[in-house]
Structure formats: structure tokens, C-alpha cells
């Protein structure tokens, strides 16, 4: 039987742009291949039936890397903690291939841990198994939260011992294949600006619009240059996408950890999960990465950092897009962000279409209560999901009746009760459904991840990992 993963109609979209954007590389050879995770939810998106794709097919395609060539290590630079770094690029992964989904959109298969490339520098090009497990979990819980995110298609343990400064070593190795819209980053354009290649910038920008913003071409009015009127609209749409993305992170209680420009996708998708963390309690100063000594990428700073990264990108795009137009587009970021964040938080609280003033007051009271009480951020929303009852509209005493610090929740409780008075019986039932939909049963705070990893590393017990994934999906 032929391998369905190798029989896909791979589309060389990046390769067709030419060698200015990538280096052709080879994959590493590994001593062992154990499939630890396969994402059957993604297979229908590329026209495959999960029953037709066997475990050995994943190993052949995404562990042994048979048949599909060439592999492309993409070139990029980036601002890392505010400093420009021209020595970047895919250092432990490559673009495996691109396929057209059943929705006619273009998707990437990108590897992580597949071996050394010209951009590995002194690193080994490998991915720790713990790093792979963490990325699988991050992507799936964020997807469950409704975040526009890359996801892991497969995770294969590869039988090597790796040495890392931030993990007990030797630690186990893995190779992952990531499923995403694109691996083109802000830093991809920043590299072209660094080398003063406006021709390559325009060529890549046309490609991005064609593949990921094709709806904009229908809005252009210029006959002389079919892209000219799209460039500003592209940047405006990117501003909107990034604003919505960071609002989704904030509502989910997610702290990315390393918001360098090389970790930001030009499609506005969340990807590349390293030292991320979910906030245990509402703490604006919470920092995910142990090496972020200044707190630059702290939880509350994420919207400002994303806006700043969009501003930095203007320099790289200025050869094609008018600076004044980009500045005016970026001025809309705050409004895009606040609108999305307000809407997402109201959903988590069960409401829909509240008046803006009511929503803002409830949001203010919610954040104050979470800050003052230091109740678990995810615990609060899970408890709201589990305990909410239409009877709350008639009896305020039932609303979080057993909250340990009643004086801290009382202002919130009073206003929540006030808003319930405007809801009909049918609307209260819809609230119950929203609370179920937007508040996952499982959180992904550090102790949860460490518990899963402890079972794997001490006993090679993967059941807690699979159980956690199932709880995320439920």
C-alpha cells in the first residue's frame, strides 16, 4: 500500500520563488522511531481519512523523511529582546512541503528537530522530547480556546540523548512536524531589508498576498499593477490579525515567552512554542521565560510588544508600502485589540452582545476580583462553567456561594447578577452553552505539564499525556 502522506499533491510555492529565500538541506538520520503523537483531527483538512493513514506511514514520511525533496531551511533575521540579530534562519527544522487543503488554502508541513542546517551555528539541530510534548499541548489547548494557531501533526521519539542547559541531561530526543498556514515570519522580510533587496521584498509580499490574503486582490482598483492597492490593505489586515491574536492569548491566560520578530508569523498565526506558560493567577508581571530578566515579554506587555513588532516591520516593508499609510493602519491596533479582548472575555463569562459600557464594567470588575483574590485564573472560569445555573438570575446568594473571600467577589457578584436580570430563560440556556464552549475543562499551568512529563521520563508512561489531550478536547 502506498503512503498517503507521500502521495499528497505537494505544491512547491516557496521553492518556486527561487533560492534567495532558503537553502536546500538534508534531514538527520535517527537511531529509533517511536510515534508518540499523531493528530488525526488534521488529516481531513488535507483530504485524508485517518483510517487509511497508518502509524508506519507517519514514521516513513515524518521520521525517516523518505521521498519528498527538496527540504528547505528558510532564511530570516529578527529582533530578539530588542536587538537585531542577522545570524538567524531555520536552525533545527525545514519546510518539509506545502499542500493545498480541501478548503483550497495553502498549508505548510514544517519540521522541528530534524537536524543541522547552515543556521544551526553551534547547536545540534535536535528537539528534546519534552520540548515536543510541550508544543503539542500548547497548540491543542490554544486551538481549544479558539486561538488561530499552528498545530502538531506528528511527534516521533528518535532515540538519542541530548544535552541541554535547562533540562536534566542527557534528555530524550524527538522530531516534530508542524501543520501551519505559513512559516514566513516578520524576520523573513527584515532580512531582505537588511540586504537592501526591495525587489525580493516585493516578490515575497506578492506571494504572501496571493497565498494568504487573496481576498484583498478582489478589492483592488488599479489595473496597472494588480497588487498596488493590496499592499496597504495587507498591512492593515495584518495589524488586525495580530491584534486579534494577542487578544486571544490574553483571554486564554497565555504568555508566549519569546515574542521576537522571528517568532511572529506573517499570516497572524500563533506558532513556535518555546518557554511559554499559562498564568496560574492573574498577574500582569508574570514572565514565562527564565532568561527574560527584564520582563520584556511579561504577560501584560504582550499587546504592546506585538504592536511594537508591527512598527518594526514597517521599516522592512517601506520599500513597497507607504510609511504614512502603515502608520495610520497601526493606529487602529488598540481598537482592534480592545474589541476582540472584550468580546472574548465576555464569552468566557457567558455573555454575548452586552452594551459596551456594561461589558467594560464587568471586565474591570472581573480583573480586579482575579487580581485581589489571586484565585486560579483557569480555576475561576472552570468553576463558572461547572456551577453556573439559570437559577442565579433569581437568587444572588447562589452565585459563587462558597467563594473563600466573599468580600473580594461581592462587587463582581452584584454586577453579574444585575446583568442576568436582562436575560430570558432561553438566553440563560445559551449562556450555559457558551460557558461550556469557551472554558475548557483542563488548564495547562506548569504543574500540569510537569506531572505529565514526570510520568513519561520516570516510567515511560504516556497515558497521562493522552488523557490530558482528551480532557482538552472534551
UniProtKB/Swiss-Prot annotation:
Annotated residues for binding of ATP: 89, 91-92, 112, 124-125, 178, 185, 272
Residues where Mg(2+) binds: 263, 272
Residues annotated as catalytic: 262 (proton acceptor)
Swiss-Prot/TrEMBL cofactor(s): Mg(2+); Mn(2+)
Entry keyword annotation includes 4Fe-4S: no
Documented EC number(s): 2.7.7.-, 2.7.7.108
Keywords, comma-separated and alphabetical: ATP-binding, Magnesium, Manganese, Metal-binding, Nucleotide-binding, Nucleotidyltransferase, Transferase
One MF term in the entry's GO annotations: magnesium ion binding
InterPro entries associated with the record: SelO
Enzyme class: transferase
Keyword Nucleotidyltransferase: yes
Catalytic reactions on record: L-seryl-[protein] + ATP = 3-O-(5'-adenylyl)-L-seryl-[protein] + diphosphate; L-threonyl-[protein] + ATP = 3-O-(5'-adenylyl)-L-threonyl-[protein] + diphosphate; L-tyrosyl-[protein] + ATP = O-(5'-adenylyl)-L-tyrosyl-[protein] + diphosphate; L-histidyl-[protein] + UTP = N(tele)-(5'-uridylyl)-L-histidyl-[protein] + diphosphate
Role, per record: Nucleotidyltransferase involved in the post-translational modification of proteins. It can catalyze the addition of adenosine monophosphate (AMP) or uridine monophosphate (UMP) to a protein, resulting in modifications known as AMPylation and UMPylation.
Family, as annotated: Belongs to the SELO family.
HAMAP family: YdiU_SelO
Protein name as catalogued: Protein nucleotidyltransferase YdiU
Organism the protein comes from: Trichodesmium erythraeum (strain IMS101)
Source species taxonomy: Bacteria, Bacillati, Cyanobacteriota, Cyanophyceae, Oscillatoriophycideae
Amino acid at each position: 500500500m502506498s503512503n498517503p502522506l507521500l502521495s499528497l499533491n505537494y505544491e512547491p510555492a516557496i521553492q518556486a520563488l527561487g533560492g534567495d529565500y532558503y537553502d536546500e538541506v538534508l534531514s538527520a538520520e535517527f537511531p529509533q522511531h517511536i510515534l508518540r503523537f499523531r493528530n488525526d483531527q488534521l488529516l481531513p483538512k488535507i483530504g485524508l481519512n485517518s483510517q487509511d493513514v497508518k502509524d508506519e506511514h507517519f514514521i516513513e514520511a515524518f521520521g525517516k523523511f523518505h521521498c519528498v525533496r527538496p527540504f528547505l531551511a528558510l532564511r530570516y533575521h529578527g529582533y530578539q529582546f530588542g536587538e537585531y540579530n542577522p545570524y538567524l534562519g531555520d536552525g533545527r527544522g525545514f519546510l518539509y512541503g506545502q499542500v493545498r487543503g480541501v478548503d483550497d488554502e495553502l498549508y505548510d508541513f514544517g519540521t522541528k528537530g530534524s537536524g543541522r542546517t547552515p543556521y544551526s551555528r553551534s547547536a545540534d539541530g535536535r528537539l528534546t522530547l519534552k520540548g515536543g510534548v510541550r508544543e503539542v499541548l500548547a497548540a491543542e489547548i490554544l486551538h481549544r480556546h479558539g486561538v488561530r494557531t499552528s498545530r502538531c501533526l506528528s511527534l516521533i521519539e528518535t532515540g538519542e540523548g541530548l544535552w541541554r542547559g535547562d533540562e536534566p541531561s542527557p534528555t530524550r530526543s524527538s522530531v516534530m512536524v508542524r501543520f501551519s498556514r505559513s512559516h514566513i515570519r516578520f524576520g523573513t522580510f527584515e532580512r531582505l531589508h537588511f540586504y537592501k533587496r526591495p525587489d525580493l521584498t516585493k516578490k515575497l509580499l506578492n506571494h504572501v498576498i496571493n497565498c494568504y490574503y487573496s481576498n484583498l486582490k478582489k478589492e483592488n482598483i488599479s489595473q496597472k499593477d494588480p497588487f498596488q492597492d493590496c499592499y496597504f490593505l495587507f498591512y492593515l489586515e495584518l495589524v488586525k490579525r495580530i491584534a486579534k491574536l494577542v487578544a486571544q492569548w490574553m483571554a486564554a491566560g497565555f504568555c508566549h515567552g519569546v515574542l521576537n520578530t522571528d517568532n511572529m508569523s506573517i499570516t497572524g498565526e500563533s506558532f513556535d512554542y518555546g518557554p511559554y506558560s499559562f498564568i496560574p493567577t492573574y498577574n500582569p508581571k508574570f514572565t514565562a521565560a527564565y532568561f527574560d530578566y527584564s520582563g520584556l515579554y511579561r504577560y501584560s506587555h504582550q499587546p504592546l510588544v506585538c504592536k511594537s513588532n508591527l512598527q518594526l516591520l514597517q521599516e522592512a516593508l517601506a520599500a513597497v508600502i507607504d510609511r504614512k499609510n502603515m502608520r495610520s493602519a497601526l493606529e487602529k491596533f488598540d481598537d482592534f485589540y480592545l474589541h476582540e479582548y472584550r468580546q472574548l472575555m465576555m464569552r468566557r463569562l457567558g455573555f454575548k452582545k452586552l452594551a459596551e459600557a456594561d461589558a467594560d464594567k464587568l471586565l474591570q470588575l472581573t480583573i480586579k476580583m482575579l487580581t485581589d483574590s489571586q484565585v486560579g485564573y483557569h480555576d475561576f472560569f472552570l468553576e463558572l462553567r461547572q456551577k453556573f445555573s439559570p437559577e442565579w438570575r433569581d437568587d444572588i446568594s447562589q452565585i459563587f456561594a462558597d467563594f473563600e473571600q466573599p468580600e473580594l467577589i461581592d462587587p463582581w457578584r452584584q454586577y453579574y447578577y444585575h446583568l442576568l436580570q436582562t436575560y430570558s430563560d432561553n438566553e440563560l440556556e445559551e449562556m450555559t452553552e457558551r460557558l461550556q464552549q469557551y472554558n475548557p475543562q483542563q488548564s495547562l499551568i506548569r504543574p500540569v505539564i510537569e506531572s505529565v512529563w514526570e510520568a513519561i521520563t520516570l516510567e515511560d508512561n504516556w497515558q497521562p499525556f493522552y488523557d490530558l489531550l482528551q480532557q482538552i478536547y472534551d
